[in-house]
Amino acid sequence: MSFTRWEVFFGLSVLALTMPFSAGVTNLRDVSAINNLYITLGAPSLHHWLAFGGDPCGEKWQGVVCDSSNITEIRIPGMKVGGGLSDTLADFSSIQVMDFSSNHISGTIPQALPSSIRNLSLSSNRFTGNIPFTLSFLSDLSELSLGSNLLSGEIPDYFQQLSKLTKLDLSSNILEGHLPSSMGDLASLKILYLQDNKLTGTLDVIEDLFLTDLNVENNLFSGPIPPNLLKIPNFKKDGTPFNTSIITPPPPPVVDPPPATHRAPPVPRIPPVSGVPPAPFAPFAPLQPQQHPPPSPPLVWSPPSSDNGGGDPWNSVSGQPTLQISPPSGSGSGKFWSTQRIILVVSSVAIIVLVSGLCVTLWRCCRSKIYNRYYSGARKDLQRPYFNKPPSQPTPTMGKVSREPMVKPFDGYGAGDRKYGYPMPQRAEESRRAMPPTSYYNKDVNTPQKPLQQPPRQFQSNDTASKRAAHFPPGLNSSSSATVFTIASLQQYTNNFSEENIIGEGSIGNVYRAELRHGKFLAVKKLSNTINRTQSDGEFLNLVSNVLKLKRGHILELLGYCNEFGQRLLVYEYCPNGSLQDALHLDRKLHKKLTWNVRINIALGASKALQFLHEVCQPPVVHQNFKSSKVLLDGKLSVRVADSGLAYMLPPRPTSQMAGYAAPEVEYGSYTCQSDVFSLGVVMLELLTGRRPFDRTRPRGHQTLAQWAIPRLHDIDALTRMVDPSLHGAYPMKSLSRFADIISRSLQMEPGFRPPISEIVQDLQHMI
């Protein structure tokens, strides 16, 4: 049998192409799944684990157990693993055991899980959200451990298909509600841990299960404990307020009226109070006689109904008057009326307390207005590109102040987070060349400006207007003052707030370039009408006072303000080179000036700004929206961080739209100083790679810069390939390695593992 030349060539080609994949032992599907798991866990320090490729079975990756070529077990308990889990867990072909317990994994439990799983242990982590309903599809599941997390909501009613489940641990979460009825279908269940939750209702659902261990401590269960549960060998119920009084005993048997001879004993009868004969005998059990009646007992009697017939009630045989037992149609017993009085008193007190609480709440709301409606959450900034347009000549006439509607989120005072791929205007380079040199603005702005129609008033930072809860040190730069501008003067400087002078726009407000006489420039932020409506004059002045205290070399300086005719504006120093985002992604001429040393100095300047906010200010000031568009560059490429102290004015935005800067915990409403550190790490990644933090034009898996870069930071070959090509290799390898290490520590998924900002500043200073 002979082969033609092309057949031999084809066979060798196929062999060469398949050799890299056939060399490994592990199923390629499992390799891809564990690579994705490694990435979502934040690239932890696990022996042999890789983000791409590898042979988990052949190389015996840490915690991995295989059967032939398939991964069947992954056990990494107590390895200090962070990050989160994703739906790619379902890609494992035949995995049976996943033990990720006692780590720092956060986020929600993924909806997609491998159908072959038998033992799933996620206990002692930081999972949040609800228990996913898709667990009902795991018919082979025998052990499920979700204890010691932050899971909330009710336990879903989906246990019908989990007939093989023998252990269920839901302890130490924030679960509430009743036990689902399908939990009674768990015929194989032996161990059930529900302690330390907020579960309510009764335990009747599980009374027929053959349990050996049951722990319901520290819950809110009520009702009697079913007798079958009391027979469980290991039954713990301390701290749960079981209330056996809500279940009434069996009703007493109906007793026929005794014969007449039994009514004759000499028992003192209680005459009717109103002279009406007692109600006829009703088939109720008589009251038991009191053995030791107290002297002169009070007589509690209910007024009999006028339609009561004749007959004698049963009385106590002890000679002491007792309460008459009336039929349901009567007026009720004395005990009944006593209970009503108690209920009436308690209800009255409760109503008084509720009304008082409502009054206090309304009073406090009137004081604070709606300030607390705003919190700084995640938000997506889609802002125009910042570019320096040629100065416009002021118009000879003055028009009314423009009232722009609220627009897309604002970023920096120029150069916001625009839609990626936004073209740089052709005249941008010409405009930049037309800008004044570094000394574009002198510090004599605090003196009255000649164009002002009214003499400027000095606003001292120790004002007494609206002393709100400020997040700034009260004594910092207490002598600072700001120039009070008039609307007329700012109209003149900004060409009547013309669109040509807009250098940024967003939800806080539009930013205009203001040209003063003698070629000086300012940046004027005109707060949106939405902010003006929700902020009083006193609150605005307090904001100005607080921002004035944030005066350091790397914080964008507030120079003045305007508060006239319902309009509020903040006047900042002007940075002619725009933002770092412009320099990296839009301005090619400026990009060429970003040498390695310049980039390290920019990272150091940004870090020092955050160090001032986090560690000098008491209490600390969290920026909450730190990104490359907030890092402005002056004429010497020195850093000025914008929007410091304005976080509370930002409306809530979905964290999924934060363009790759948001730390994982921000998704759940937690924003701390360490969240700023994570955002700084992303900015340093931009400096290292020249890539955008999020780019939809790239392949899936490469779109989010942090997710793509983290696994490569400790691989020297991959690290050199990811450096910005415009540097042309002009950087020391030792400096590159140190910078990558700083970035890697800043991008830890767990906030507690990220270094304090002072440590980052110190490490960057050692690189200079």
Swiss-Prot record:
Record entry for activity regulation: Regulated at the post-transcriptional level.
Keyword Metal-binding among UniProt keywords: no
GO cellular component terms, A-Z: plasma membrane; plasmodesma
Carbohydrate attachment residues: N70, N119, N243
Bias kind Polar residues: ranges: 315-334, 439-464
Domain of life: Eukaryota
Miscellaneous comment: Cannot be functionally replaced by the SRF1 to SRF8 proteins. The sub/scm phenotype is sensitive to ecotype and is greatly reduced in cv. Columbia background.
Every Protein kinase domain range: 497-768
Bilayer topology: Single-pass membrane protein
Chain ranges passing through the membrane: 342-362
Start and stop residues of the LRR repeats: 94-115, 116-139, 140-162, 164-186, 188-210, 211-231
Impact upon substituting P473L: In sub-18; no phenotypic effect
Residues reported in the UniProt entry to bind ATP: I503, G504, E505, G506, S507, I508, G509, N510, V511, K525
Species whose genome carries this gene: Arabidopsis thaliana
InterPro entries, A to Z: Kinase-like_dom_sf, Leu-rich_rpt, LRR_dom_sf, PRK1-6/SRF4-like, Prot_kinase_dom
GO molecular function, one term: protein kinase activity
Gene behind the chain: SUB
Record protein name field: Protein STRUBBELIG
GO biological processes: cell morphogenesis; floral organ development; leaf development; leaf vascular tissue pattern formation; plant ovule development; plasmodesmata-mediated intercellular transport; positive regulation of atrichoblast fate specification; positive regulation of trichoblast fate specification
Record function comment: Regulates the expression of transcription factors that define the cell fates. Acts in a non-cell-autonomous fashion, functions in a radial inside-out signaling process, and mediates cell morphogenesis and cell fate across clonally distinct cell layers in floral primordia, developing ovules, and root meristems. Seems to be required for the regulation of cell shape and the orientation of the mitotic division plane.
